[in-house]
Regions:
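Nucleic-acid modification enzymes, centered on SAM-dependent nucleic-acid methyltransferases
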Residues: 1-50, 66-111, 125, 145, ...
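A short glycine-rich, Lys/Arg-flanked "PGG" loop and its adjoining helix->strand segment in the class I
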Residues: 119-135, 156-161
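Short glycine-centered segments of the SAM/dcSAM-binding site in methyltransferase folds
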Residues: 138
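Glycine-rich phosphate-binding "P-loop"
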Residues: 110-118
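Conserved proline-anchored active-site loop of SAM-dependent methyltransferases
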Residues: 48-72, 129-132, 141-144, 158
Length: 172
C-alpha cells in the first residue's frame, strides 16, 4: 500500500527540491518522509556530500559488459527530453544520455581495455562511497552476475577503495 502526499506535507527541504520531485511523493502509508537531497551526477564525484557524513550507502553497481545502461536509457531519454527539457534544462540539455563515465565494460567505447576501464570507474565510485561514509558506516550492495570475471572486478575494486568484505548472501 502506498500513499501519495503533497510535497508541502512532506516538509521539502527547499523550493528547488519541490521543483525536482514535482508536487507529490509516493510513500508507504503512515510513514512521514524526512528531508531529502536529490542530486544527479556521477558516483565518481560526490563533492556535494561531506566527508564522513553518511551512515549507509546502498547501491547496485553495473554488471560489467552485461547491460549498457546509457544506450538503453536513450530510448526513454529522447522522449522524456521532449517534454521535460524546458522544465529541467540542467538534466535534459544534452541530446542523449552521457556515456563517458558509464561504468560498464564496452568494447565499442574502450576497444583496448574495456574491463580495466570498468574496474577503474568502479574503484573511483567505491572510493567516493568510502569517503562519505562515517567511521563504522556501511556499504551494502547487490550484484547479480553468473560469470566470475565481473565479480572479481567488483571485489578487487572494493578492496582497492579501502573496504573489506564482512558478509555475502548468495542467491541460488
Amino acid at each position: 500500500p502506498w500513499e501519495l502526499v503533497r510535497v508541502e506535507r512532506a516538509d521539502a527541504a527547499d523550493e528547488s527540491e519541490t521543483k525536482r520531485v514535482g508536487n507529490t511523493l509516493k510513500i508507504p502509508v503512515g510513514d512521514r518522509p524526512g528531508k531529502a537531497n536529490l542530486s544527479c551526477g556521477s558516483a565518481t564525484n560526490l563533492e556535494q556530500i561531506g566527508s564522513e557524513s553518511i551512515d549507509l550507502v546502498v547501491t547496485d553497481p553495473p554488471f560489467g559488459g552485461l547491460v549498457h545502461y546509457s544506450e538503453l536509457s536513450d530510448f526513454f531519454y529522447v522522449w522524456m527530453r521532449l517534454i521535460l527539457k524546458d522544465r529541467y534544462p540542467e538534466y535534459f540539455g544534452a541530446e542523449y544520455t552521457p556515456k563517458t563515465l558509464e561504468a560498464v565494460s564496452n568494447r565499442a567505447r574502450q576497444p583496448d581495455h574495456p574491463d580495466a576501464y570498468y574496474q577503474r570507474l568502479l574503484t573511483a565510485s567505491w572510493k567516493e562511497a568510502h569517503r562519505i561514509l562515517k567511521p563504522g558506516g556501511m556499504l551494502a550492495f547487490t550484484f547479480h552476475h553468473s560469470e566470475d570475471a565481473p565479480w572479481v572486478s567488483v571485489l578487487e575494486s572494493l578492496f582497492d577503495a579501502g573496504f573489506y568484505l564482512e558478509a555475502t548472501y548468495p542467491i541460488r
